[in-house]
């Protein structure tokens, strides 16, 4: 372990043990990581802060032990959620299990996390049904009615009826007036008879 990682480890241990009661600190921050768990992963601080390219064997051994005894604490470590004052690189923390040959840890941490509630559909106010909109606006519904065509009267004209009743043509054509030639010839014959009768009377007188 080089001097840089030693100083970081010492700072981590000092921050955990600076209080008179480490248990009271854990109760206040409400974390599943106990002081012994955090002290066991002090060898990972160099890798988590970008001070080393690969995690040490002590770091990987501590991670493997946490997979069986403190999975919740391990999930906090790989997600950079440990409540300590050391600046942990989140990308390096997520890649730490794979670098130690434990690639399934991030998947197990996602499976153990509580699912977020599914958001419900957004409400934009009460929706009105088509029936309500039609009943509330009778004039608007009337505007969509088809225009009614005027009904044509099927009753024949009064003039046509009067013409057909007088013997005329039902289509309204009046019959031609009777010819006056028969009556004139009849009156002419009657005049001749009267003249002959008058002549006969005068002859006998």
Swiss-Prot record:
Propeptide: 180-205
Segments crossing the lipid bilayer: none
Pfam families for this protein: LTP_2 (PF14368)
UniProt subcellular location: Cell membrane
Membrane topology designation: Lipid-anchor; GPI-anchor
Known role: Probable lipid transfer protein.
Family assignment from sequence similarity: Belongs to the plant LTP family.
Protein name: Non-specific lipid transfer protein GPI-anchored 21
Species in which this protein is naturally found: Arabidopsis thaliana
């Amino acid at each position: 372990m080089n001097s840089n990682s030693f100083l970081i480890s010492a700072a981590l241990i000092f921050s955990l043990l600076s209080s008179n009661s480490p248990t009271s600190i854990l109760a206040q921050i409400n974390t599943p990581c106990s002081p012994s768990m955090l002290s066991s992963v002090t060898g990972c601080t160099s890798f988590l802060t970008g001070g080393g390219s690969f995690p040490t064997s002590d770091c990987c051994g501590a991670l493997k032990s946490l997979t069986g005894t403190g999975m919740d604490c391990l999930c906090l470590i790989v997600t950079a959620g440990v409540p300590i004052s050391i600046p942990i690189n989140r990308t390096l923390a997520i890649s730490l299990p794979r670098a130690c040959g434990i690639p399934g840890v991030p998947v197990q941490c996602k499976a153990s996390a509580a699912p977020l509630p599914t958001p419900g559909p957004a409400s934009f106010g009460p929706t009105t049904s088509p029936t309500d909109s039609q009943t509330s606006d009778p004039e608007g519904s009337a505007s969509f009615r088809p225009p009614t065509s005027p009904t044509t009267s099927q009753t024949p004209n009064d003039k046509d009826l009067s013409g057909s009743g007088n013997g005329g043509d039902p289509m309204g054509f009046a019959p031609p007036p009777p010819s006056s030639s028969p009556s004139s010839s009849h009156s002419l014959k009657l005049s001749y008879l009267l003249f002959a009768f008058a002549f006969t009377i005068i002859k006998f007188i």
